[in-house]
C-alpha cells in the first residue's frame, strides 16, 4: 500500500480504508477499542490533552501500539497537523458520550450507566467524515456502546475531578481507519446534535445532561504518514 495516492478514491473504494463493524482489528472488537480510546483520552492531563489542542502539537501524547486515537475539538473548530507512524490505524470519534460513577455518583448499576450513555448519544444526528475529499458513507451504522471499563483520572484531568479510578460505559459514533499510505492526508470529522436538544434538557432528563463530546464543531486533521 505504500506510496498509493488516495486523493482520487471514490465512494466505491473508500470502504477499503475503513474497518467493518464486525471486524476485530488487532484481535479486539470495535467496542473494546472504543473503551481504549476513552482510557487514553482521560489519561492525559488537560494542559497537554489532544482534545484541547488547536494545532496538533499534542497528537502523540500517550499514543502507543498499532492504533492511534483522534479526538474532536471540545471548544471550537480546529485544524490539527499531525505526524503519524507508518502502519498505524486511526480510531476517531464522530461524537461520543460516556457516563461514569465518578461523574454521576447517583448512578448505582451497570444498567444505569448504559441508559445514561445512550440517552446522551441519542441526541447525535448525521455524523460526517471525509478522507482526502471523499465522504465516508453509512456512518450512522457505526454507533457502538462499550462494555464496562475502568478509567483512571490523573491530576488536572479534563473532567476537573479528583484523581481516581472509576468505571464507565460509553456510547458513540466512530470511524476506524486502516493504515494509510505514506504521504499527506486530510481527514475531516464532524458530529451534529439534534435541534431539539435544548427542549430535551429543559423538560428534564433522567440524568444531568453534559452533551456528547465534541458537539457541533468540525475538526480537520492534516496527517503526514512517514516512513519508519
Where does each model-flagged region fall?
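N-terminal segment immediately downstream of the Sec signal-peptide cleavage site
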Residues: 5-64, 215-217, 223-228
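Conserved aromatic-histidine-acidic binding/catalytic patches
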Residues: 21-25, 80, 172-178
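Extended, well-structured beta-strand/loop surface patches
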Residues: 125-182, 190-225
